[in-house]
């Protein structure tokens, strides 16, 4: 099984509840696109399920650059879309600037807290789920070495890594954890080539189970792990179907 932020899709669903049926909701995906097989796609799945269940519609946009964050927020707010849901912590700064200008618009941000009366912040205890992943990886490992590949090097992803390492240690303190971050910019969420390279490097160090908390970059991790006949663990959405029998 894969680790899932079970409430991510639900957050998009709740935020676009029937109480807002008069106004059309909007969903803004983070960089990487809505079909990243991870974080964005789970938000899209939740919103689409709401649309299917209620017969209502929602607007959406896939960002191409950082500069579009505030533009997209203002565009939807000006159009009267309500609520406006953002998939990702990186919207925090733009939302802080925009929310006060549209007090009658409800905003929802995932993975970050923005303190404003018209903002609902949805955050998770990533380290707790990752602790269980670490226990599972330790139990599955035959080499005594497991790996972790994060996306952007930020406190959020370090919480994933920390919980994972503690879970491994709880099962067997002698197991080695090899950890790498993909990068320090938002591009780290959508670099499957780099994910593949890091996976190969960790395999060369003996890792036979690798956990990816890296958004779209994780696609490269899971693919390479399957190609090299080792196990992987996905994140944010159920990724077992991508490589049956190879994804825990």
What are these regions (language model features)?
Residues 1-23:
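Gram-negative bacterial Sec-dependent N-terminal signal peptides
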Residues 20-248:
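A residue-level marker of the well-folded mature domains of exported/periplasmic proteins
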